[in-house]
From Swiss-Prot:
Name of the encoding gene: COMMD6
Protein name: COMM domain-containing protein 6
Coiled coil: none
Family: Belongs to the COMM domain-containing protein 6 family.
One GO CC term on file: cytoplasm
Length: 85
C-alpha cells in the first residue's frame, strides 16, 4: 500500500465508527481505453461503516494482489496481538 501522510492511529483515540458489512470480490482487468490487453487481477473491497449516530457510509477501494497480500499480513499481525491480550 502507498505511504499515508496521516498520523498513525492512536488506540486511545475516540474511534466511534463501527464496521457494519465487509464485502470483497476478485476481479480481472482485461482491457481499458488505452490498453487492449491488461489481464491483471485485483481485489475490490466494499466496507459499510456506521458512525456514532447510526448513519451508514459505504467506502469502496481496489487493491493489486501485492497490496492485498500486505493488507492480509497486517490483519494476521493484528489477530496475533489480539490473541495475546
Amino acid at each position: 500500500m502507498e505511504a499515508s501522510s496521516e498520523p498513525p492511529l492512536d488506540a486511545k483515540s475516540d474511534v466511534t465508527n463501527q464496521l457494519v458489512d465487509f464485502q470483497w470480490k476478485l476481479g480481472m482487468a482485461v482491457s481499458s481505453d488505452t490498453c487492449r490487453s491488461l489481464k491483471y487481477p485485483y481485489v475490490a473491497v466494499m466496507l459499510k461503516v456506521a458512525d456514532h449516530s447510526g448513519q451508514v457510509k459505504t467506502k469502496c477501494f481496489e487493491m493489486t494482489i501485492p497490496q492485498f497480500q500486505n493488507f492480509y499480513r497486517q490483519f494476521k499481525e493484528i489477530a496475533a496481538v489480539i490473541e495475546t491480550v
